[in-house]
Amino acid sequence: MLRLDTLNGHTLAVVYNFACHPIMGVPNGGNTADLTGFASKVIEDNLSAGTVALFVQGCGGDINPVRYKDVHQPRSAEPLGNVLGLSVLHAVRKIKCEAAAPLAVLNEKLRLPRADHSERIDTLLAEQSRSVKALKGTSLNLKTFLELANKYNLSQEFPSYYSHLYFTEKAQGRDDLLKLDEANRKNLRAYIENVVTMEKLTRVQTNLALLQKHQTTNRAAGRKPLEVEVAALRVGAFVLVTFPGELTVEVGLNIKRSSSHKTTFVAGYTNGYIYYTPTAEQLRNTGGAQEDSDCLVAPEWEQLFYTKVADLLKKL
């Protein structure tokens, strides 16, 4: 983070960098600045009057808030934002501002190779076809499935009626209820298999649409390299590198580990937007996540970016 003080020692601004999609939301479902908005309020309320807290998104392409899909309690970004804000305050009070801190700004162009998604598109089309063919008719609809699922989860041993009727049938040498349970359980399994297949199909179709969209864009560009701006900023010991893609966390960690500057920060989503930019390894080991498919660049982009960053950091 970066702390800027006025000459009289008051804090003018705090720039803080954190990696996470701000998608937690608030309980009433309204518009919100999310966890970073709450964090900025905590920071501004606890420093000099008029202090401005400025959030800079980090390498959050594959980072989401904990419990952001929770269905058992209202989802609120405020607790997470408060924790983030307190963490910033804890660190910012340790920073000592220097009147003669060096200032440097660099920005250069970088040409990145575009991806050819044709092989993955073919793979997903085949998977889509297999999934559709795997769907089979059952004797249940949603209403009867929910009724049976409730019954058979409430009572594993005697789901269809009270236990005494099962024992009566057994004493009479009959197994009507047992046969009914066997048939119902078979139909429940078949229905659940269809649901699982449909969930898989929605993921396949979502990723397929993303790949096809970016394949169309890249073909329209004639496979010309994608030109982006990479910038580097130094204010005293604070060093920030920027990139227009949704960088994943491993990219940021790699840059920090290799940097000769003690406090190096990385900002994605900056000076343009080129969708997700996963590591080369993530692009080779696709797992159905959005960042695997919502991507314009080829795996070689990563090393080119590291090389450019290393050059800029040396110049700072």
Short names for language-model regions:
Residues 1-316:
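Non-catalytic substrate/cofactor recognition surfaces at enzyme active-site rims
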